[in-house]
Regions:
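Structural motif
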Residues: 130-141, 298-305, 403
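Alpha-helix N-cap/helix-initiation sites
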Residues: 134-139, 173-177, 226, 382-386, ...
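Feature primarily recognizes SF3-like P-loop helicase cores of small DNA viruses
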Residues: 144, 153-160, 164, 187-235, ...
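Short, well-ordered alpha-helical segments
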Residues: 121, 139, 178, 182, ...
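Active/binding-pocket-proximal capping segment
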Residues: 235-236, 412
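Short beta-strand micro-motifs enriched in acidic
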Residues: 423-425
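N-terminal nucleic-acid engagement/recognition segments and initiation subdomains in replication
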Residues: 1-128, 136, 153, 206-212, ...
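P-loop NTPase catalytic core of nucleic-acid-dependent motor ATPases
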Residues: 95-214, 392
């Protein structure tokens, strides 16, 4: 007959004397191997390769029961009071992750030990399974994987916009844009899916959820928007800390070590969004019934070798000298320079940013349209012309029929002073000033008139 081994006790009293919260915490941490820890402001316990929150006293004491028999007595520290005081005696971290950063980031608790750096070639083998449009896109896909693991500063990672040229019969559909993002994000726990039209509160609640802690890639999939612009999304990309309301907790924060990915056919972004983006193009792949399973198997079976290769690139491989940088200098130095042809890739990236910048394209169209209107009204564009703001807004709306007058005015204000000069007359009348290329400085201005059609309005 087997005699059961007596369990250790965890009690708020010793020899009938009450124990302080500090002594109880010291005893608990010794029992559990220095757990729980405070992560993102919340008590957490280990859970496989990750962590799980302990949001209330019942959860905490259920966890303690794994290690000792809980005997809580009257007259000692109440459970609720111990739960409230325990965080002050535990190790604190901003974030926890089962996946490494290279170099490791301060304030992040890593629940697993990473492989040593080694030039295994497995990273190139993985990237080679995809269908980049050019050799430079292959390099940018590799840079995207390195970015997932890069231990760089908060909010200093570009958005990766995965798209196609759209010249094939399917117009870019079925090229594997989403598959590229999701499969490679599997190296670091998978994606956090965001909806463009979701509210700010909803978006931040998703990002701050403990279930999202182990994932570090945010995906906006299959974007369908002309001139995609979002103050919220643009702010998320560059902020150092993501703050908001966490369900059943209250105020919460996480450091912004996330990488943002957008998949889109025919990318058309605002200027701010275009400048934040690195455009990666893919082409229609050669179909294979086993490609997906084989690629997933490569990641599952050779994860250590792939990550060892990533670590070698980020920590051991000397970076190539860059001829310049863009708005992401830390990323260029820490990631892009570790690829084979960083200067050529950087030049291509700048070209593609200009190509997807809908603001520049719209501005050129508006200038051409205004030039036509000036020529019709003044017989020559080589003049100085004062155009009333409402008339100029009307001209913009002739070209952009989706604009309201307010939107047209906002668009014009964004163009000033790069294209038109704004002028307010002493009488209070407001104008945009058109100055033709051949107009002399002393050329007297022509003032156009405009009457508001109240009936039409």
């Amino acid at each position: 007959m087997t005699i059961p081994t007596p369990r250790k006790e965890f009690s708020n009293k010793s020899n009938n004397a009450s124990l302080s919260i500090k002594k109880l915490a010291t005893h608990l941490l010794k029992l559990t191997g220095n757990w729980p820890k405070v992560i993102s402001g919340q008590l957490c316990a280990p859970d496989g390769d990750g962590v799980m929150p302990l949001p209330d006293p019942p959860c905490l004491f259920a966890y303690i029961d794994r290690f000792a028999e809980v005997k809580w007595r009257r007259g000692g520290v109440p459970k609720a009071e111990f739960f409230a005081g325990l965080p002050h005696n535990c190790e604190r971290y901003e974030w926890a992750s089962p996946h490494p950063h290279f170099p490791p980031l301060p304030g992040v608790y890593y629940t697993t030990k990473p492989p040593l750096p080694a030039n295994t070639g497995k990273l190139d083998e993985l990237v080679a399974r995809f269908s980049p449009a050019t050799e430079y896109d292959r390099l940018l896909i590799k840079a995207m994987v390195l970015t997932f693991f890069w231990g760089g500063p908060k909010g200093k990672r570009p958005v990766f916009a995965i798209t196609t040229d759209g010249g094939d019969a399917k117009k870019g559909r079925g090229a594997g844009k989403t598959t590229l993002a999701e499969v490679l994000a599997g190296l670091v726990g998978g994606v956090i899916g965001l909806q463009v039209r979701a509210s700010t509160d909803r978006t931040r609640a998703v990002l701050l959820s403990p279930a999202a802690w182990g994932r570090r890639v945010v995906l906006i999939d299959n974007l369908k928007s002309y001139r995609f612009s979002s103050d919220e999304f643009e702010g998320l990309v560059t902020c150092e800390e993501i703050t908001g309301h966490r369900l059943h907790h209250g105020f919460a924060a996480r450091p912004n070590y996330l990488t943002y990915v957008v998949t889109v056919n025919g990318a058309s972004f605002s200027k701010d969004m275009a400048e934040r983006s690195v455009v990666v193009k893919v082409k229609q792949p050669t179909t294979s019934p086993t490609w997906y399973a084989d690629t997933r198997a490569l990641i599952t079976e050779h994860w250590d070798e792939i990550v060892a290769d990533v670590r070698w690139h980020l920590v051991k491989k000397p970076g190539m000298k860059l001829n310049g940088t863009d708005r992401w200098p830390d990323w260029c130095r820490g990631v892009l320079s570790k690829t084979d042809k960083p200067n050529a890739a950087l030049k291509l990236t700048e070209q593609r940013r200009r190509a997807i910048d809908a603001d520049d394209g719209d501005e050129e169209d508006v200038v051409d349209h205004v030039r036509t209107r000036i020529a019709a009204a003044c017989e020559s564009v080589d003049r100085v012309v004062w155009v009333p703001v409402l008339l100029m807004a009307k001209w913009v709306m002739e070209l952009r029929r989706d604009f309201t007058q307010h939107q047209a005015s906002q668009f014009l204000r964004a163009m000033v002073p790069r294209v038109f000069q704004y002028h307010r007359h002493s009488a209070g009348t407001r104008y945009y000033v058109w100055r033709g290329k051949e107009a002399e400085p002393s050329t007297p201005p022509i003032t156009l008139s405009y009457e508001v059609n109240n009936a039409a309005h």
